[in-house]
Regions:
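Bilobed "Venus flytrap"/periplasmic-binding protein-like clamshell domains
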Residues: 47-52, 61-78, 132-184, 198-200, ...
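Bacterial N-terminal signal peptides that target proteins for export
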Residues: 1-12
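Alpha-to-beta junction loops
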Residues: 81-82, 99-108, 150-151, 187-200, ...
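Acidic, polar ligand-binding/catalytic clefts
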Residues: 69, 73, 77, 82-146, ...
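Extended ligand-binding regions for polar small-molecule ligands
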Residues: 23-28, 66-78, 137, 143-151, ...
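Extracytoplasmic small-molecule ligand-binding "clamshell" domains
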Residues: 26-109, 257
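Periplasmic-binding protein-like
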Residues: 49-50, 125-136, 198, 202-243, ...
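C-terminal motif of bacterial Sec signal peptides marking the signal peptidase cleavage site
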Residues: 18-21
Length: 267
């Protein structure tokens, strides 16, 4: 375990050094800010595997990366507190854990529905939404998706499930409990396409021969830091933290480290 911790800290050292430099120009967090952001004294970061926006394995050693993962460690370094990763199967479970106060931080789509359950800092990254299909799928273009008989997979409890459920007039949604199961359902032709952000879609496609991400998009995700409701005292600090990460170029470095594709520009 200690070896793994040393490897992780080594991989994140450039991030921590940049954060330390940024912190020199940012006021130190006061007691109220720390109480809001890390009430237990440890920053509990909620992640789920398979999405570069959350957590993926990168490099020959398979070290952990991803925006929620790396931003969480960067924030912990800025605050001067330890970080604990809390892993879930899918994003909906991360949001539920935030609502319950079981985790303190994640990075995810700041949708209108989620904003009713958690608080968001300003948007840091915009990401295109699209579809993944297998060779031989009856869906060859986005215009083919919402037709009778088409089965479109989504992550169970995701924003995509809610948005497409309202938009579709003909296609049927097929919820998948995890990204691994979504891959299997695509391979077994239990769905004709899978819908989510392109960061996830390209990751899935890399692991699935004879699959491709359709050209075009059906929308955008606005990705932002999320914290539990009732901790708004910490939001001004998160605003400055995000601004510093973007201005220093470190946010873009994290995007590249995670291998995140499909971005539509940062704000």
């Amino acid at each position: 375990m200690r070896i793994l911790q040393r490897l992780l800290l080594s991989a994140l050292l450039p991030i921590i050094l940049v954060v330390a430099g940024c912190a020199a120009t940012r006021p130190a967090p006061d007691a109220a800010t720390l109480a809001a952001l890390v009430p237990t004294g440890t920053l509990r970061v909620g992640v789920y595997p398979g999405s570069p926006t959350s957590m993926v394995l990168v490099g020959k050693t398979g070290e952990k990366a991803g925006l929620a993962h790396d931003l969480g460690f960067a924030l912990g370094a800025a605050l001067g507190v330890p970080v604990k990763l809390v892993e879930f199967s899918r994003v909906a479970q991360v949001i539920d854990a935030l609502k319950a106060g079981q985790v303190d931080f994640t990075f995810t789509n700041a949708s209108e529905s989620r904003a009713r359950d958690v608080d968001f800092a300003p948007t840091l990254v915009r990401l295109e939404l699209g579809y993944l299909v297998m060779q031989g799928s009856p869906i060859g273009a986005i215009s083919d998706v919402d037709k009778p008989g088409m089965r479109v997979g989504v992550s169970q409890g995701s924003t995509s499930q809610g948005v497409l459920g309202r938009q579709f007039k003909n296609a049927t949604l097929v919820p998948a409990p995890s990204l691994d199961l979504a891959q299997e359902m695509l391979r077994q032709q239990k769905m004709d396409a899978f819908a989510t952000n392109k960061g996830i879609l390209f990751e899935l496609s890399d692991a699935m021969p004879n699959s491709r991400v359709l050209q075009g998009r059906w929308g955008y995700e606005a990705l932002a830091i999320a914290i539990p409701k009732g901790r708004q005292t910490g939001l001004p600090y998160l605003l400055r933290f995000g601004q510093d990460m973007a201005a220093s170029g470190q946010l873009q470095s994290l995007v590249q480290r995670a291998g995140l594709r499909g971005t539509a520009g940062s704000e």
